[in-house]
């Protein structure tokens, strides 16, 4: 994880249409992307992604259902010198329950924390939608380790990124479904069931899903 203490490298999208002043509804900030069976990239097969930023300049999101294998949150805190290594590391309950995800294939050495809006760092936390925020500095990990962090949080290593127009094209090609997110699904501990739950959220039976289905 990067040790930088600065604002995350994502920008809040501009929502006003240049001609009418009306909100542009085409962007997907705060939405879930659900991979379709046609998805050929194994890194994203059966993935559920929370879209943190989406604009004409591209998109950025965090995969919610890819555990980072043997990576342990306490070990990461030790590596970052946030806590000292000992035989009996004692963390607050919220930190003990913290899951580490593979957030995506971009900047895999950097950590991104999706969290509830009860925690905010000026000039570092990016509010997204529906009480969900993103922070990518060490300060939030230090707060979590001390029991002073957000009530709900996920630590992701890396993120998923799209070039301008790329995500829109993938959706048109039936690579992704999309639907509104909710904190219960984002922060729920049932990692293995998130894909099925996300599909049920939009009324789709996973067993009936085909490569030809369109986007929601």
From Swiss-Prot:
Pfam family of the protein (one): DUF179
GO cellular component: cytosol
Region feature (Disordered): 1-25
Lineage: superkingdom: Bacteria
Chain intervals with Basic residues compositional bias: 1-10
Family, per entry: Belongs to the UPF0301 (AlgH) family.
Protein name: UPF0301 protein Nham_3550
InterPro entries attached to this UniProt entry: AlgH-like (IPR003774)
SUPFAM superfamilies per UniProt: VC0467-like
Gene3D superfamilies: VC0467-like
């Amino acid at each position: 994880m990067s040790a930088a203490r600065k604002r995350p490298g994502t920008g809040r999208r501009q929502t006003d249409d240049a001609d009418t002043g009306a909100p542009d509804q085409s962007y997907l900030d705060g939405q879930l992307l659900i991979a379709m069976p046609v998805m050929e990239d194994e890194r994203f097969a059966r993935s559920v992604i929370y879209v943190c930023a989406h604009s004409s300049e591209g998109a950025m999101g965090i995969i919610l259902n890819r555990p980072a294998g043997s990576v342990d949150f306490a070990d990461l805190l030790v590596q970052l010198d946030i806590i000292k290594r000992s035989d009996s590391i004692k963390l607050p309950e919220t930190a003990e329950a913290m899951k580490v995800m593979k957030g995506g294939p971009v900047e895999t050495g950097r950590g991104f924390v999706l969290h509830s809006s009860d925690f905010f760092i000026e000039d570092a936390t990016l509010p997204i939608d529906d009480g969900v925020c993103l922070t990518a500095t060490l300060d939030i990990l230090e707060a979590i380790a001390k029991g002073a962090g957000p009530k709900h949080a996920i630590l992701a290593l890396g993120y998923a990124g799209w070039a301008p127009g790329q995500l829109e094209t993938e959706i048109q090609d039936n690579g992704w479904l999309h639907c509104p997110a909710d904190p219960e699904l984002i922060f729920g501990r049932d990692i293995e069931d998130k894909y099925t739950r996300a599909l049920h959220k939009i009324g789709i039976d996973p067993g009936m899903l085909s490569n030809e289905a369109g986007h929601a």
